[in-house]
Every structure is written in structure tokens, then in C-alpha cells.
Amino acid sequence: DLKVGVVDIGRLLADSPQAKAAQIAIESEFGPQQRELENRENELKARSEKAQRDSVAMSDAEREKLEKELRDARRDLDRREQEFRDDAQAKSRVETQRVNKVIFEEIKAYSKANGFDLVLTGGLQGGVLDYRESLDVTTAVLAQLQAKYKPAAAQPMPQPKPPAKSN
């Protein structure tokens, strides 16, 4: 008899503590920079609106100088935002690959430990459209991921080695 299981990778990516921790790490790393960029965007918008209101009272030279400053500031902000997006996306890809590796290793370990001949992917991201609920092993794999998860803060700090004794 062929023993078959189906696992919903999307659910594991959404619900595993490893994936949630990766998302929190990305948000904590990039959140402050995102807020700074949003503040700069708001400041630039306010400067632009003020310049538009005040432009009537300016000379042509003053208006052109201010418009150039605003264009330069916009270009600089656009460049910073693009760099931020690139950095955040790169970090997200790295974290996603790391979490995927952990999840796939856990699926393989579960499959081997429970004597499965074949484990397929189901759910929205999978290749199996319809299957009996009795074939779904997602909850069991998720339980193993949860059991093996150790938050970074909970891991013991390496202890310094005692100084070498000199004779």
C-alpha cells in the first residue's frame, strides 16, 4: 500500500513560529527606516504645498531656485525609497528561503518518521486541487515546527571560556 500525505505550505508559512519570527525580525529591522522615509515624504509634501502658496510673492529667480531644490529633494527621496525597497525585498527573500528550508526539512523528517511514500503540496500554493482531509498532514507538521521552535532570545548565551592556566 502506498502511504500518501498532503501538506499546505501556505498555511505553514503563515502559521509557523519560524515564519512569524522572520516577519517580526524584518519589521523591526526596517520599520524605523520606513517611518523615517514616511516622515521625509510628509515634510517634502508640506514644503511643496507651502512653496506653491508662497510662489505668488516670489521673484522668478526665487521660484526657480525653490523648484530646483524641491525637485532635487524629490529625486533624493525617491532614490532612498528605492534603496529601502531593494534592501527590504532582499532581506525578505533571504528570510523566506531560510524559513522554507526549515519547513521542507521538517516535512521530510515527518514523512520519514511516519512512513510516508509520498507527500504532496496542497492548498492555494500546491499542486493538488482536491484531497480527503484524512490525507492532510499540515497540522502535524505545524505541531512539530512549533515544538522545535526556540526563540532567539531564549537560546542560551555562549559562556566565555575560562582563561588558560599558566604554570
Task: State each model region's role.
Residues D1-N114, L118-G126, K148-N167:
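Amphipathic alpha-helical segments
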Residues K112, E133-S134:
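A generic structural micro-feature
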Residues G127-Y131:
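A structural signal for short loop-to-beta-strand junctions that line the ligand-binding cleft
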